[in-house]
């Protein structure tokens, strides 16, 4: 193999086509644009959807996202039941080791599922039903 014998892979180098220059050129009349009409013409502005009511007009003008709202990671009672032994301490570190949460956000315990083991739970927040279930199983819930 020598440099002067190297060839490009098929399809890597495509010859330039001058479009809209007559039938004989191979790309005359519609110039590869299909039918005449709106889509044959020049481009369109940002947000234009072809006459359909655009997204920014379909959504409402009301409401906003509160910059101070807290977004919680959710852990359910069934997750605690599956991943922890009786009399265990459930905190952020143990939940992270059990692969139930990421470190970045606060955690809220919700009451989905049943809890039969006595656990000591220390988290940022919990629903009323989750706290009741932990205490009914003989455990204790503490807010961080």
UniProtKB/Swiss-Prot annotation:
Q: Where is the composition biased (Basic residues)?
A: 15-26
GO biological process annotations for this chain's record?
translation
User: Mind telling me which GO cellular component terms the entry cites?
Assistant: cytosolic large ribosomal subunit
Q: Report the GO molecular function annotations.
A: rRNA binding; structural constituent of ribosome
What Pfam families does the entry give? Ribosomal_L27A
**Gene3D superfamilies recorded for this chain?**
3.100.10.10
InterPro entries associated with the record: Ribosomal_uL15, Ribosomal_uL15/eL18, Ribosomal_uL15/eL18_sf, Ribosomal_uL15_bac-type, Ribosomal_uL15_CS
Alphabetically sorted, this entry's keywords are:
Ribonucleoprotein, Ribosomal protein, RNA-binding, rRNA-binding
Segments of this protein annotated with the region Disordered: 1-52
What does the similarity note say?
A: Belongs to the universal ribosomal protein uL15 family.
The record describes the protein's role as: Binds to the 23S rRNA.
Subunit structure comment from the entry: Part of the 50S ribosomal subunit.
Q: What name does this protein carry?
A: Large ribosomal subunit protein uL15
Tell me the name of the encoding gene.
Answer: rplO
